[in-house]
Amino acid sequence: MLALVDANNMYVSCERVFSPRLRGRPVVVLSSNDGACIARSNEAKALGVKMAQPWFQVRHLEKTQGLIAVSANFELYGDMSSRMMAIEARYAPRQEVYSIDESFLDFEGVRGDLVVLCRDMRAAIWREVGLPTCVGLGPTKTLAKFANHVAKESERKPGAYPRRLAQICNVGAVGQAELEELFAATEVGNIWGVGRRITTKLNESGIRTVLDLVRSDAATLRKQFSVVLEKTLLELRGVSCMALDDEPAGRQQILVSRSFGKAVTSVDGIVEAVSEFAARAAEKLRQQGSMAGAVNVFFTTSPFRKDDRQHEANVTIPLVRPTADTRHLVGAAAGAVHRLYRPGFNYAKAGVMLMDLQDAGAQQAELDLFGDVEPSSPDAPSPGRAKLMAAMDTLNRRFGRDSVRVASQTAVSNGAETRSWSVKQERRTPRYTTRWEEMPKVRC
């Protein structure tokens, strides 16, 4: 039996852990540069706020309906997610982390009442992290996702499904007749993997509910759509077509990019931003145990600013040897900026992509800056470089991100750090769990 554990309105719930005043009130989390609503509380959904809706379209609800908006705090959300996933892992022998707020658990070999076990797990997550969750249980991944949908909607919309299925729904424990009733009450577009385009085509073919899909001919679906939809159908019938991936394959490319909070015109500003993005990408590279053989750097003006002169810079730099060293990757990215930068332009976005990724275990060509390497051979291999990067990562985890960093990541003006390119986050809450200086203070 598989379970899909999902935090309810993850980003909003994280904010509510440290700001109880937000509970029961309409809340939205805004995207980078505070442009669009990327998360909504149930109360905000009830006001009609749509996912990805531009903030300016609903800003009037602040005054008329008491809507509260906060800027995205991804550092906080990521840390809270890690804590939640660690708790879930205690309850099952295998876990696949699917996204920042979802994971699959495999209960094969686990004895006892799984609903009771999941109830204990939900209580532990709430007690230790403060996040509300829903759990869906089923014999396949797709059925577990469907069960999670039922568990959520039963709680959020009373009457949508039987109340007893709220919070924790085990479709493996309901009879066939009741399962078909649940299928009949669910639009086909709510099924995992069935997107808008496929939903439209299915509706045109007379398939509007999940029950309609389950009763369809598998071979016909494969012919008219794809083998993927056929597998979805089989999974809904209880035939497992997707195995649990408890050791997901590493990404083949790692991209970090941002739109700037305001236009950047100086080469130093672009170098600073690109250095930051390269450092973030290097962290992700080491986390998955890889090295990069090439670095792609780009920065561009905004095509939406018609009165501005337009310029787009893009280059890929092959590296002498694959590396996961932040210094080497930042150096390559910064060098590319100096070669491509042109004065007189209002740059609006930049990014760094690490390419040609390889297993670090198969590539140990690393340079130790503090080792016995001749200055004339900067690319000479040394195992010390990997140890230095591991120490850097450890210090940053312990004392907060960027406690140890490459100098070009942050510009300095009159002794003070400045980031002209930083995204607009006028409403960001403190990073309570990862920054000592932002930790909540209790006064006795």
Description of each model-found segment:
Residues R111-L114, S154, K306, D359-Q364:
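Short, charged/polar, Gly/Pro-enriched secondary-structure boundary elements
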Residues M1-L234, A243-L244, S376-C444:
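Gly/Gly-Pro- and Ser/Thr-rich, intrinsically disordered tail segments characteristic of DNA damage-repair
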Residues G138-T140, T300, M353-L357, Q409:
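Short loop/turn motifs enriched for small/polar and acidic residues
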Residues N190, I198-Y347, G361, P440-C444:
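DNA-contacting surface of Y-family translesion DNA polymerases
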Residues N9-M10, D34-A36, S302-R305, L357-G361:
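Short, charged/polar surface micro-motifs in flexible loops or helix N-caps
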Residues A334-R398, R405:
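C-terminal hydrophobic structural anchor segments
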Residues S103-E108, A313-V320, A365-V373:
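Short, hydrophobic beta-strand segments
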Residues L2, E102, P132-C134, A294-N296, ...:
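Broad gene-expression machinery/nucleic-acid interaction feature
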